[in-house]
Amino acid sequence: MLTACTKENETGGNTPSTPEAHGRLYNTRWQTTYDDHSIMDEGYYQDHYYVYRCTDVIHFTNNNSGTRHIDKEVYDLITQEVTGEHADSTIRFTYVYKGGDSQYGPGVIYWENGDSNKFYVQNIGGERIYVEDLERPDYNPPCFYLVQ
């Protein structure tokens, strides 16, 4: 099922066409499948920061300047997950890079100990690669899915 997204927040520049999310959520809390092609149109990754709200999924990227940013609304949604049975667990996200041609994705991104500055992925060897490193200008900015 394709889920249309609506733009919730933007800063600067021209507005690209509205993207579609190709995420297909399973009932299992932490599992998802996705199509790593055509996740976002090209304009989405140019000069701007956007937050898109979709049914069951949240997207955010930075503006490819190397600056870490997470929208407060998205942060609040994430922190709501750190309750109840999952209070001591790592929050997991799926993510994908434009082009799907990275050793880091598609895959799972983790939120470490409720610290909004500690998002990371693990490579095949188990090394933690933190999102602030992934978001340098020499990387394609990733697209994150909050798995609900």
Model-derived features: positions:
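Short loop/turn segments at connectors of secondary-structure elements within structured domains
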Residues: C54, Q103-G105, N140
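A broad helix-preferring feature
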Residues: M1-L2, D56
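Short, P/G- and charge-enriched loop/turn segments at secondary-structure junctions
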Residues: E10-G13, Y45-D47, E81
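Short, solvent-exposed loop/hinge segments that bridge or flank secondary-structure elements
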Residues: E20, N27-N64
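Contiguous, well-ordered beta-strand patches that form the walls/edges
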Residues: H37-M40, T61-R136
